[in-house]
UniProtKB/Swiss-Prot annotation:
GO terms for biological process: cell adhesion; type IV pilus-dependent motility. Coiled coil: none annotated. Major component of the type IV fimbriae that plays an essential role in twitching motility, natural transformation, and protease secretion. It comes from Dichelobacter nodosus. Belongs to the N-Me-Phe pilin family. This is Type IV major fimbrial protein FimA. It is a single-pass membrane protein.
């Protein structure tokens, strides 16, 4: 009488390992892209926080804090976990249409935040420039970040 065979053969185990390797080859880059996109989205959160400061500065006719700002001013920068957002540009009062750019811009530099060493290597050291519109929203104005990591809320329609 033959005894019952138990377990898997070596070939079956090798096939399973090969399948897992193929799946990992697709999953790891997709996961890295996901992490980079989520970290890049923090820049938009920082920029949204600067909208109020820009609005305050526009009352003085400037995008940025003036040199003689009061002691309560927070400055032209906001530092997050993965990036640094900074206000720049020259206010253009002649623009009145809500979709026009008002001259103010926010430059987000990834990798200069409080956890800069933990930023995805796909966006570390990259910049995203956001142009503020008259209606207060932002649109993409440049930078060297890969377009696939730019948050959808600010992507320019091509």
């Amino acid at each position: 009488m033959k005894s019952l065979q138990k377990g898997f053969t070596l070939i079956e185990l090798m096939i399973v390992v090969a399948i897992i390797g193929i799946l990992a080859a697709f999953a790891i880059p997709a996961y890295n892209d996901y992490i980079a996109r989520s970290q890049a989205a923090e820049g938009l959160t920082l920029a949204d926080g600067l909208k109020i400061r820009i609005a305050d500065h526009l009352e003085n006719g400037s995008c940025m804090e003036t040199a003689n700002a009061g002691a309560g001013e927070k400055g032209n920068q906001d530092i997050g976990k993965y990036g640094l957002a900074e206000i720049s540009g020259d206010y253009d009062e002649s623009k009145t249409d809500a979709k026009d750019e008002n001259g103010c811009k926010v430059t987000i530099t990834y990798g200069q935040g409080t956890a800069g060493e933990k930023v995805s290597k796909l966006i570390k050291g990259k910049t995203l420039i956001l142009l503020q519109l008259v209606n207060g929203s932002y649109t993409q104005g440049g930078g060297d970040i890969d377009p696939k990591f730019v948050p959808n809320a600010v992507k320019k329609v091509q």
